[in-house]
């Protein structure tokens, strides 16, 4: 069987691009998916439209699919979905063993390069099913946990949490001892509206433009304690495939996203810092555990001014918002609300911001001007997708995340009393796209209309 399959794939990959038939590519794609499945290679971000493995989808693309009403818009949607499939499938293929009986990583890459354009060209948008992205909540947990009752009982604790986090913004902040700064951009960033001249009016910077944007708006990270677990670092995998944080190489992991607000598609810049642990504050600390982090997101208006910032930890916890635009008013939100920063924050288009973290908890307690007098170390920017294909000491490739989008080693004790709220393994670190940000109600960090939910 393997010999027949390998012969078919070898024949397929030997054909020139113009000679590939639809059925050849469909057969090759099916064989690749089966090879990945047999190898136990999965990725929660690599979702595809059912029946169309060459079309990658996420919450944003599912939203855009409904917005694509003209032929040019529909054609652009297919291109975007195909580009996502290329990204996802090539990352999955990197994790195939070199001695795989069906596909090597190189063979899989060649198949994708040859066949994705063929399959995209023959896709009829009108026949596609609407993309449905499952939410990150487990309904059965809420049913088993008598959610209506437990959500009501949790109201007091949620209110206490809001008061505690708001108080941290007002109380005297710890004095920073060291800060980590991004590289200075070599070129001025492009305004999002200059790269949104396409049928769907989405800001789509090219790689060089995106890098300039990421560098320009990147924050300085200030820490008040320099013990190892309070220092950001590069994520690496050890011999046991367990993640370790290399603090000798400070890094922020970046990705772009989009939100829809007031009739426009807005560009968002995401920055993720990783720490080795949240240490215990006493033996009953249910929030402590291996790995911790911070995600800082910058939402840009079409002219490049900042509309607002928001932040979470990689568990999806501690959602906080930091308005910049004076016209923003917090909406009446159902369920538990994000914590609102009590002061207006400066626009990172005009000045670099510093994020001051509380020691050990890594709570963000201040957003301030940069202190030029502090000892400063540089950090580098890395594509967050590299976390989905990390090199291992034995030469193979693995992922930080499991098939469900979680980092299992980061599980927290809080999962034992928060499970009735429907968030699987509450407190564990999660992959982008899996960040549930509310215990009461259902809300996700990557919802396409989250800005419209947050603000009037």
Model-derived segments and their meaning:
Residues 23-188, 290-292, 303-456:
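Domain-length functional cores that host ligand/cofactor binding and catalytic or interaction surfaces
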Residues 7-16:
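Bacterial N-terminal signal peptides
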Residues 218-219, 265, 441:
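Glycine-centered secondary-structure boundary/capping sites
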Residues 228-309:
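Short N-terminal edge-element motif at the start of the domain
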Residues 177-246:
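Charged, compositionally biased non-catalytic regions
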Residues 19-21:
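Boundary at the C-terminal end of the N-terminal hydrophobic targeting segment
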Residues 1-6:
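Positively charged n-region of N-terminal signal peptides that target proteins for export
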